[in-house]
A protein has these predicted regions:
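Solvent-exposed, polar/charged alpha-helical surfaces in well-ordered, non-transmembrane soluble domains
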Residues: 329-336, 340, 438, 442, ...
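Conserved catalytic/binding loops enriched for acidic/polar residues
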Residues: 461-863
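The catalytic-center signature of Zn2+-dependent metalloproteases
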Residues: 42, 49, 355-376, 438-495
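Sec-exported extracytoplasmic/periplasmic mature domains
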Residues: 336-347, 449-450, 454, 491, ...
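Auxiliary tRNA-acceptor-end handling modules of aminoacyl-tRNA synthetases
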Residues: 31-323, 341, 350, 356-409, ...
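Active-site neighborhood of thiol-dependent amide/isopeptide-bond enzymes
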Residues: 323-327, 331, 433-437, 465
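Bacterial Sec-dependent N-terminal signal peptides
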Residues: 1-32
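Extended catalytic-interface subdomain
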Residues: 384, 389, 395-403, 444-452, ...
Length: 863
């Protein structure tokens, strides 16, 4: 779930040469405030005057010892805060423990971490308060520098809650009543409904604290929050909802040494700002998120000699006991598969996965001491791997994988559509358990990779030549379809019948082993600055090797190498092979999915999946037109940062588009299957059948809108402007499209319904985009915009808005660009063609032309 609050993006600090701003502030306050210093016995006795006696307040209390001492007196919950905890860095971690059906259906489930916040407790006996403060921990300053005083004043702490001190215990420990922050009366510790996007208020009369637990380094509070939401337009259409939550308050460990990120390796990151007297601008960095893996003290010499050693603290994942037994081992195997990669970083036996001990009464899947693969009973078809991160250093403290039960539906769909022609075992509605287990193992490894801090590497699959994906030897040796399991490479749709390919999914590959070594190899250095030259050399060793290329996930595809669901180094060749398989699959669709006496619902869904897969291939190809190879470069690596997709490749892509989607694929939309079924998609209202005519029209229109996309055309103009030799121009693109789409009109030949549809879609795409471009300039349009915009990975917990987006953004005044002129000129040329052809057309074609002329004249203002 995407983070919407700054305190959920809590950032890293820390190394021995630097002091945390926050620590400086705490130190200054403790020295300056006599009320918080050690008191004599007489002073302590006097200090307790004015408070209710400790024994009276807590008479009959159920007490639990831990990080904080917890007292429960009937329905009242008290925290007794040890003096040694005051001023310490604590992290609030909120998770969902249970949900009702409406929230489940929205994709929000047990195990999700929806809110984190760093806090400190401060005791103020003068005002009889315990203040809870938060701060932005990305700021670091050397306490010896003059600027540290200014940093302290300009990056101060903020109060999020104030508790009245009810009494003082032994050693004057403050006792506070905390019900209001856990029962829904206050949002400071747990702001559930805002963070899951529901808004509204907690209905406090129907909300309560269920359980409190204390452990040496954390406390756990379980609550139930109720609310009411509107389901329709009338006041009567309301739904009552109750959500179970677990709040952990965790003592953060001694800060780990961070590691600076590098755009050439895909890790989630957290930002840092370093202030020093010597700098002329603030140093802004990103630190990667990773587990604290260090050799034991007695093994450090062995480790540095290159011997494999076990880490001080291995990583343990617990499998939710609610996981169906037949999938438990596959999920465990997917976790254990990463041990080989960690050996590249010098560590052995790093990871283990197991079921919790049923006799362990302390085990709780919502306790942040445990990393859990949670199994969610839901119709949602997905899996995700978020982590809880130390906001000061990027250290991963705990990870959770949310495994939705219905993810198997997605796997079944992919495998049948993409590989059904080469594997008879994946053709039916239910696969053999061993086939599904292999797919589950693949997904498990991918999601576990995220919990190690790894981001999607969408560019990995581009390293493999398309033809090599048809080789059993190559795919077995190289690990399936990509050198990284963190790509969305999916299943091998390139392989053909008779090729003998068995390894159809990615495995943990060359890039993954490299990334784990780069992120986790221990250097023994004390600061990220010290180890920076070392980590840079590790990357330089493989610079230019496509097996080690990292391609970031893109919101709008600019670099066609880095796409989801694609395979190989040529989308056109891969798409052709994929379509060959789809053409063979389609006639078997009913036989594979429907038994005698059954309705055709499965076949209808299957038909829709085939259409969607065909559309995916066209989209992969589309990205090459106006595409740019974007390389994360550094000085000295001899690479270009921006390379237009080669002219020949763009022409090949346009030819594919003309062949497969600007021409009606009769095999797909005029299939004899339409006598029995229509393509149908799953919706909240159930299975909805669709007209093949409308589906084709919408898919084709989407591709044409993609071709007319302003940013795509502006990228083409950009390289035309820069005088790159042999690049496709906007004029050439329009000439090619017009010559193909209106070829029969130019020859004054009648058009069939599909050809008329294509002309309508083309003109509509031009008109709509042109009208948008010439809309009145709005306030703020002249505000500056960066050429390279920020990228936010949409996958998981540490989406950063300050990472390279790999998207080109252009000034808001697009109406002054050449794109507007080119589109208007194209509309005028199309109108001229139609005008000449109109009087020599048959009735249907003439009606079509008349309609188009009305639209064109209106769009062009009768010019």
């Amino acid at each position: 779930m995407k983070n919407r609050y700054w305190f959920m993006d809590l950032k890293i600090l820390g190394c021995s040469a630097w002091l945390f701003l926050s620590s400086n502030m705490a130190f200054a306050q403790s020295k300056a405030s006599p009320k918080d210093s050690v008191k004599t016995e007489k002073e302590e006795t006097k200090k307790k005057e004015g408070f209710e006696p400790y024994e009276k307040l807590l008479k009959g209390a159920e007490t639990k010892q831990g990080l904080l001492k917890i007292h429960r007196v009937k329905d009242k919950i008290y925290f007794e805060i040890p003096n040694e905890v005051l001023g310490k860095d604590l992290l609030i971690v909120n998770k969902i423990s249970s949900v009702p059906a409406p929230i489940n259906n929205a994709g929000i489930n047990k195990g999700m971490n929806y809110e984190n916040k760093i806090i400190r407790f401060y005791k103020d006996t003068t005002n009889k308060k315990v203040w809870v403060k938060t701060f932005d921990p990305q700021i670091t300053v050397n306490s010896q520098d003059n600027i540290s005083a200014s940093v302290k004043d300009n990056y101060g702490e903020s109060i999020v809650e104030g508790f009245e001190i009810k009494t003082l215990g032994k050693d004057s420990t403050a006792v506070i009543q905390v019900n209001n922050v856990f029962d829904g009366n206050a949002k400071s510790f747990n702001n559930l409904f805002d963070n899951i996007g529901m808004g509204g208020s907690v209905r406090t009369k129907d909300s309560y604290i269920d359980e409190v637990k204390a452990f040496p380094n954390n406390v756990v509070v379980k609550s139930y929050f109720s609310t009411q939401i509107s389901e329709g337009k009338t006041s009567a259409e309301k739904a009552d909802l109750t959500v179970g939550t677990t709040t952990n308050i965790v003592l953060l460990p001694e800060p780990m040494v961070g590691r600076f990120s590098d755009d050439r390796v895909g890790y989630f990151t957290t930002p840092k700002m370093y202030f020093t007297d010597s700098q002329q601008k603030v140093e802004q960095r990103e630190l990667i998120t990773r587990w604290r893996l260090e050799p034991k003290a007695e093994d450090e010499a062995k480790y540095l000699r290159g011997e494999l050693v076990e880490p001080k603290k291995p990583i343990v994942y617990y499998i939710d006991p609610a996981t169906p037994k037949q999938w438990q081992q596959a999920i465990i195997d997917g976790v254990h598969d990463w041990n080989k990669a960690f050996e590249k970083a010098g560590f052995k036996n790093v990871i283990s996965a197991k079921l919790p001990d049923p006799n362990d009464t302390e085990f709780d899947v919502d306790d942040v001491r445990y990393s859990v693969i949670t199994y969610a009973a839901s119709s949602m078809a997905n899996a995700m791997g978020p982590s809880v991160v130390d906001p000061r250093t990027g250290e991963i403290l705990e990870s959770d994988i949310i495994w939705w039960h219905n993810v198997m539906t997605l796997l079944q769909s992919w495998m049948r559509v993409q590989t059904g022609m080469i594997d008879p075992q994946v053709r039916e509605n239910k696969f053999p358990d061993d086939k599904m287990a292999n797919a589950i193992r693949f997904v498990s490894s991918h999601e576990v990779g995220h919990t190690f801090g790894l981001k999607h590497n969408m560019g990995a699959s581009f390293a493999f030549p398309v033809e090599s994906l048809r080789s059993p030897e190559f795919t077995e040796k190289m690990g399936g379809t990509a050198p990284s399991i963190m790509d969305y490479a999916r299943f091998n749709y390139v392989a053909q019948e008779g090729d003998g390919v068995k390894q159809i999914t990615p495995k943990i590959g060359v890039y993954d082993e490299f990334a784990i070594n780069w992120g986790y190899r221990w250097t023994g250095k004390k600061t990220p600055q010290e180890e920076l030259p070392i980590t840079q050399k590790w990357i330089e060793k493989h610079q230019g090797d496509p097996l080690y290329f990292y391609g970031a996930q893109q919101e709008e595809t600019v670099d066609p190498r880095s796409q989801a669901e694609d395979l190989g180094d040529n989308a056109m060749k891969a798409g052709e092979y994929g379509i060959i398989n789809l053409k063979k699959t389609l006639p078997n669709l009913i036989e594979w999915s429907t038994k005698n006496g059954e309705n055709y619902n499965e076949a209808k869904s299957f038909y829709n999946q085939v259409i969607n897969q065909w559309y995916v291939y066209n989209n992969h190809v589309l990205a090459n037109i106006g595409g740019i190879y974007l390389n994360p470069t550094v000085k000295g690596d001899q690479q270009s940062s921006y390379i237009p997709v080669p002219y020949e490749t763009q022409k090949e892509a346009l030819a594919f588009i003309k062949k497969h989607i600007l021409t009606l694929p009769e095999w797909l939309f005029l299939s004899p299957l339409n006598q029995k079924i229509r393509p149908a998609k799953n919706t909240p209202k159930g299975l909805v059948e669709q007209s093949p005519y409308n589906v084709f029209r919408e898919k084709q229109a989407a591709i044409l809108y993609g071709l007319m996309n302003d940013n795509k055309l502006l990228r083409i103009l950009e390289f035309e402007f820069l005088n790159h030799q042999k690049v496709m121009t906007v004029a050439e693109l329009f000439n090619d499209l017009r010559g193909f789409i209106f070829s029969k009109s130019i020859k004054k030949q009648p058009l069939n319904i599909a050809e008329r549809m294509t002309q309508k879609n083309y003109i509509d795409a031009l008109i709509i985009d042109t009208q948008r471009m010439y809309e009145k300039t709005e306030k703020g349009i002249f505000s500056p915009m960066p050429m390279m915009c920020d990228y936010a990975c949409s996958h998981t917990h540490l989406d950063k808005a300050d990472e390279r987006n790999l998207e080109f953004y252009f000034d808001g005044m697009k109406r002054l660009s050449e794109v507007g002129s080119a589109k208007r000129a194209e509309l005028i040329k199309v109108r001229a063609i139609i005008s000449k052809a109109m009087n020599k057309a048959d009735n249907d074609t003439q009606s079509h032309y008349q309609d188009m002329m009305v639209r064109l004249n209106k769009a062009l203002g009768n010019n």
